[in-house]
């Protein structure tokens, strides 16, 4: 039963049912149209009421959003710049470290190269010095052997000279010191001498082949020669240009070594000056024949220097050559005289002679006398 209040429609929302709407009892079609129009109006009024009770949210602040975005972008840019700066700084440090290591490497390579070069140079220098010392030692050894051979030959010649110059029974008339005391002097009161030839023979008629030599010889120093010798002795040298040796070469050495075979004579002279000449005695067995540049020397009966037919008891060898040349006693005496002179002046040059100037001068004069006598053909007899 209707009580005069409109009832709430269960199919409508609460808001619309709560709104009081006047109802009119119209026809069926007209009432339906009026009811639908009323519903639309009620819905519109409900929305307005809802709008008044709950207002719509305000629009977003665009400028604020833009500022936040800009701030974020700037912070990101600054962060990236810092990272880029750090990376560039690290890269620069690494480049500097690489450059420093490259310099160290180049310096080490240069030092290693210099050290290697210095080591090779030092090793080459040591090898060169060792070779020079070895060559010098070998040369000195050869010279020593040459001197030994020469001295042995001289000793042999001196022994031969002593043996041949000492008779088995000495002549007591020529050596008064060998006489007995009763016969040493003349008897008292004896005024006559026998005129027989036998008593005068020791003085007037010396034995054949023996020339008596005086017991004493007069000596006088030539001032020119002595001055030249003193000048040479102040600084001994083997240079032929100095006045002292130039005179000896011109007056003694040159003539003494001037043999018939000129080519071999020049070789002998060079070997004597270089101290490379060797004189060897000829063995009893047959020796191989040796040819001389200008004179054939097929046996020991021809002198290679003079070309004369002489019995050769010695032979010479020049330097390291294997060739031997047979020489006569006269040629050997001439070569030996020159070798004795050169040996003595070498001893003076080396400081081995400890004498005053005058004894040394007279020894040189004696050696020059030996060269002159050998050139003139005087030489000791061989055994």
UniProtKB/Swiss-Prot annotation:
Residues 77-128 form a coiled coil. This is Guanine nucleotide exchange factor for Rab-3A. It comes from Mus musculus. InterPro entries: RAB3IL/RAB3IP/Sec2, Sec2_N. SUPFAM superfamilies: Sec2 N-terminal region. Guanine nucleotide exchange factor (GEF) which may activate RAB3A, a GTPase that regulates synaptic vesicle exocytosis. Promotes the exchange of GDP to GTP, converting inactive GDP-bound Rab proteins into their active GTP-bound form. May also activate RAB8A and RAB8B. The modification Phosphoserine is found at residues 169, 180. It holds the Pfam family Sec2p. GO terms for biological process: muscle cell differentiation; protein transport. Interacts with RAB3A and IHPK1 through the coiled-coil domain. This interaction is competitive. IHPK1 kinase activity is not required for this interaction. Belongs to the SEC2 family. Keywords: Coiled coil, Guanine-nucleotide releasing factor, Phosphoprotein, Protein transport, Transport.
